[in-house]
From Swiss-Prot:
Catalytic activity, EC: 2.7.11.1
Compartment(s): Host endoplasmic reticulum; Host endoplasmic reticulum-Golgi intermediate compartment
Enzyme class label: transferase
Protein name per its UniProtKB record: Serine/threonine-protein kinase 2
Family affiliation: Belongs to the protein kinase superfamily. Ser/Thr protein kinase family. Poxviruses subfamily.
Amino acid sequence: MGVANDSSPEYQWMSPHLNYFKNFNKETLLKIEENDYINSSFFQQKDKRFYPINDDFYHISTGGYGIVFKIDNYVVKFVLEAIKLYSPMEIMAELTVPKFLYNNLKGDEKKLIVCVWAMGLNYKLTFLHTLYKRVLHMLLLLIQTMDGQELSLRYSSKVFLKAFNERKDSIKFVKLLSHFYPAVINSNINVINYFNRMFHFFEHEKGTNYEYERGNIIIFPLTLYSADKVDTELAIKLGFKSLVQYIKFIFLQMALLYIKIYELPCCDNFLHADLKPDNILLFDSNEPIIIHLDKKFVFNERIKSALNDFDFSQVAGIINKKIKNNFKVEHNWYYDFHFFVHTLLKTYPEIEKDIEFSTALEEFIMCTKTDCDKYRLKVSILHPISFLEKFIMRDIFSDWINGGN
């Protein structure tokens, strides 16, 4: 079950949070709950009651190497790096690869890439872990006070997450956060949203022995959604006839992007290495996107999809040390699309309703347990890019071939 380490008698005694919460009990919390004041930015962002009332950094995601916030029209990603393994210049793929592709692609396909606006290298990022611990302790002590329990910084991961998830959508709990977050945390970085993801990152994914010392800061444009967030209702709202048509749309745009990249000189080694729906972002599209192969593909939709998160990517002479040693065999575009199709089928079981499309995707990956582990190819299957080009010429994608004519 796992119990935290912040439980030594010395730490418990000196904790300012512990001493602060000794001034409160269930009755005083009830009085706070009865007040009218509520800061709507402490609702979860998926909650319709959420509203960013301050110019704060709002936590929107944590996973892998990145802790992501949004502020105004920007997305700011803090990437904790193993600086001892790589020099700062060896961990710039997220900047250099998309910029290289954008500068070399000549047609509308370049609109399907997310380029970093700015990147700062080798910053001290210890404040993120410190902030996380402060917020965790505040939540622990607040929940204990609500339940009339003895105050302690010892906790079980399972018990804490259950208690937090049960309360996070409650208006009474949000009223308490509206009072205690400014008083105890006093920061313009709001990590209450998706706090369970940050908890998993620091407590499990990176482990207690991980060094949270240094890393990079990356600034992106703010997106409408990541592709995995679109459900049937939103797909219709975005102008698609169905969720499956939307899935075909993002698959086709990514396929066209890859085909055009592989047409570039010396770029037939391009790998993204993490092609999946949550690494595809959706932006407004104010004009048609037209991409020419043997046939013309025309997209008149009011959104476009764009590939993001090139942290593990490589292309041409830009070799990524993060993935170089992980691949035991040679791979090309098919490695990415094999993983992509698996994740599409997992994310969207609705694909099964379209027999022609689902059958085509199943035939596309055609793998066994000896070939594939957790959707990742273990063997070298180097289909030429013409394999992908033939696939997208099928009637499945007739809505966009020659403008749907």
